[in-house]
């Protein structure tokens, strides 16, 4: 079950006109923090992300099912979306069983190294034009000071790679 503060952050993001994936990012971040604190574990970084996205859909974030992916994934996303629209409370027994199962999983799967590896792997799957388009879109949402800081950081990275 997501924290009230996470739901509030997601609502704030929605009010600011941010995308559904940004709103869902709050839930993913919350899930990673829970695992790092040792409340429970995850088998892989992908599982931690999937749990966060599922919680986001169940909390009412209008996050569509992914275009790519298997039938089971799309079915689960649709199920979560439907759950987000209903007001039926979560069964305590089911919720407890979920946490108990996750407690048996490792917590080192969301270390900074593991998440960095996951992010790089995910980025490699995207085309250069797609990544470039996303970067340009991100730049437009930043203010001038943030843009300047990002440009300086990019310049430092380029200099380091030479």
Regions found by a protein language model. Name each.
Residues 1-162:
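A charge-rich, low-complexity, intrinsically flexible signal that marks solvent-exposed coils, linkers
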């Amino acid at each position: 079950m997501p924290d009230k503060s996470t739901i509030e952050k997601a609502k704030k993001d929605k009010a600011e006109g941010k995308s559904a994936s940004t709103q869902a990012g709050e839930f993913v971040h919350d899930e990673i923090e829970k695992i790092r604190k040792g409340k429970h574990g995850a088998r892989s970084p992908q599982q931690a992300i999937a749990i966060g996205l599922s919680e986001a859909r169940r909390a009412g974030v209008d996050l569509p099912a992914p275009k790519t992916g298997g039938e089971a994934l799309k079915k689960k996303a649709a199920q979560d979306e439907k759950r987000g629209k209903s007001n039926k409370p979560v069964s305590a027994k089911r919720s407890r069983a979920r946490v108990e199962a996750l407690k048996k999983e490792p917590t080192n799967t969301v270390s900074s190294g593991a998440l960095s590896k996951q992010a790089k792997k995910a980025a490699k799957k995207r085309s250069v034009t797609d990544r470039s388009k996303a970067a340009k879109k991100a730049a437009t949402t930043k203010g001038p000071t943030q843009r300047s800081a990002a440009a300086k950081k990019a310049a430092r990275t380029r200099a380091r790679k030479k």
